[in-house]
């Protein structure tokens, strides 16, 4: 499986580390410094490649292998970049599964199929659901 991870922050690196154990991963990162540190971090992992560039540029996505990618994960620190990357991955390169990481919960509503997003990762929403489930479970235990 070919996976492109946009953004080499904490989430992007974790995804690349986990998926890179068994699959071909390309990390696309805009920052020169972060590219250097991530390249060093992943030098022993033969399945992970680091490419410096901006995911808003189709030529960079093509160089990353978006035309043959199975999964695209937009995990930059900026919703605008994530959404444009998702849109390009889905519409220009026909990537099968596009995942976008929501940075600002107010922008959650944008992460949908019209922007090319198949799955929206919203950590605030995930935490809220977990808290609600815990509260519900605690209430149920008290009733018993």
Go through each PLM region and give its residues.
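Cytosolic regulatory regions of ion transport systems
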Residues: 1-144
């Amino acid at each position: 499986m070919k996976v492109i991870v946009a953004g080499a922050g904490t989430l992007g690196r974790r995804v690349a580390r986990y998926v890179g154990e068994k699959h071909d991963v390309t990390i696309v990162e805009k920052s020169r410094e972060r590219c250097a540190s991530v390249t060093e971090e992943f030098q022993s992992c033969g399945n992970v490649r680091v490419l410096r560039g901006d995911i808003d540029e189709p030529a960079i996505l093509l160089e990353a292998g978006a035309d043959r990618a199975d999964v695209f994960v937009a995990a930059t620190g900026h919703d605008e970049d994530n959404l444009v990357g998702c849109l390009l991955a889905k519409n220009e390169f026909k990537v099968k599964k596009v995942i976008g990481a929501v940075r600002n919960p107010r922008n959650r509503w944008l992460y949908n199929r019209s922007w090319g997003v198949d799955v929206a990762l919203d950590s605030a929403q995930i935490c809220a659901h977990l808290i609600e489930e815990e509260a519900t479970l605690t209430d149920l235990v008290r009733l018993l």
